[in-house]
């Protein structure tokens, strides 16, 4: 745990607000050095996935030329939404540090509690309708993957 890393994540969140973005920033740390930074770019890029943490993860993976961030930590200006938390698991980040809480974010209209609630529901109960179709055709790609001898597992 390093206050300087968190200070940088917070600086990025403040800079983001001043530049028209959302109030979120993050840094990725490996071997006690910042290797990547990110701030919220949702509105500037018209990309709803361009959260500060996601941008930092993308930058770190690009810098390391690896999809795995094992051995890395992330410092975020806020407790993560489900999207960013999932990205941390998928990228294998070792540890998450955060400053503001989900409740702090909710108070300024960044409320993601409905997503946490939706994830726990059965597919048939979710607000966005989900319909399965063409499974047999789609399974062909899975069968090819399963038989592939040179696949890179992730």
Outline where the language-model segments fall.
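Zinc-dependent deaminase
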Residues: 1-19, 80, 87-154
């Amino acid at each position: 745990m390093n206050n300087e890393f968190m200070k940088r994540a917070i600086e990025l969140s403040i800079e983001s607000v001043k530049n028209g973005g959302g109030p979120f920033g993050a840094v990725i740390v490996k071997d006690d050095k910042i290797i990547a930074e990110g701030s919220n770019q949702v509105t500037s890029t018209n990309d709803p996935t361009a959260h500060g943490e996601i941008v930092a993860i993308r930058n770190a993976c690009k810098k390391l030329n690896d999809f795995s961030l094992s051995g890395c930590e992330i410092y975020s200006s806020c407790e993560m939404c489900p999207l960013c938390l999932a990205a941390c698991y998928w990228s294998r980040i070792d540890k998450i540090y955060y400053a503001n809480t989900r409740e702090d974010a909710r108070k300024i209209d960044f409320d993601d509690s409905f997503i946490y609630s939706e994830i726990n529901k059965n597919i048939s109960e979710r607000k966005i309708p989900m319909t399965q179709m063409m499974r047999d055709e789609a399974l062909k790609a899975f069968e090819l993957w399963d038989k592939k001898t040179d696949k890179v597992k992730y």
